[in-house]
Amino acid sequence: MLRTSPVTHNGSINLIKADNDLVIAGYASVEMVDKQGDLITRGALKNAFGDFMKADGYRNVQLAHSNIQVGSVIPSYTDSDGRVWKSGVDDAGMFVVIKLRDDIEKAREVAKEIRKGALRGFSIGGQAFKRMRKSDASHGDYTEISKLELHEVTICEKGINPEATFRILK
């Protein structure tokens, strides 16, 4: 597992607050057929996430795919109870730890909306390079994405992947 503290396996994100910082953590994508009929494989997520994390200045977190950077994916975070949360891809999916900015008004607005419960989901943005139409009894008809480039993680009301949601850890 990527973290030392328990996390629900229903895709929920836990909010961790330290000082004036706002840090959230949870699954931004899990391997399942999403609302658009796409299934991103864990292998694709693992490769794309590895490349994404190599350039620390470009680990973009946006609001609703708006091109406004409101935070950054960070490698890990230790909460006030001493639990370590780590970004990476595990058996459930792509788990991210995100530190929100507090130096711009839009990021402060996002933090406020998270605390109010208005923003509850994650989505990811990128470019798919390898897609294949598939069909099986458990998933029906879907498009499997086995290679992609990850450009950003976005915070939104509801993501396309229903398991990419969060709750506040109090």
Q: Which residues are covered by each model-predicted region?
A:
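Signature of dsDNA virion morphogenesis modules
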Residues: M1-K170
